[in-house]
């Protein structure tokens, strides 16, 4: 029987790469925490967001900041470029990114027609998928 701690460790290893060092993990988690705490305070507009959108912004920032660090570790590069990884694996990984949609939700009150914002979200997502292919 696998413990919850063991399952969590396995999931983390499959996310950032099983060769991640303590420094890699600390930097990744630290950057994510910094994004969660610091990023929303970098612009006055973020302070005026409704609570739900502020939480969404914090989660998005934590994911982006932590992800940038994780993706730039040797462990992550080796894991995602290991033997057996196919273009389909990379496309599925990219498809799971919901950032373009979340940005469109956060931008919904920005000036401009809603259709243009929807088109922009689709264009960003399409670019992400094309860049991955």
Locate predicted features.
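Short amphipathic, positively biased membrane-proximal segments
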Residues: 1-133
């Amino acid at each position: 029987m696998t413990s919850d701690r063991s399952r969590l460790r396995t999931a983390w290893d499959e996310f950032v790469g099983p060769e991640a060092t303590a420094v890699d993990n600390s930097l990744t988690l630290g950057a994510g925490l910094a994004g969660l705490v610091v990023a929303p305070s970098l612009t006055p507009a973020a302070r005026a967001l409704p609570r739900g959108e502020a939480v969404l912004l914090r989660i998005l920032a934590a994911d982006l900041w932590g992800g940038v660090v994780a993706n730039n570790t040797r462990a992550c590069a080796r894991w995602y470029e290991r033997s057996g990884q196919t273009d389909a694996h990379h496309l599925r990984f990219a498809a799971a990114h919901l950032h373009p949609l979340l940005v469109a939700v956060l931008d919904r009150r920005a000036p401009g027609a809603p259709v243009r914002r929807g088109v922009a979200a689709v264009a960003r997502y399409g670019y992400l998928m094309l860049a991955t292919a």
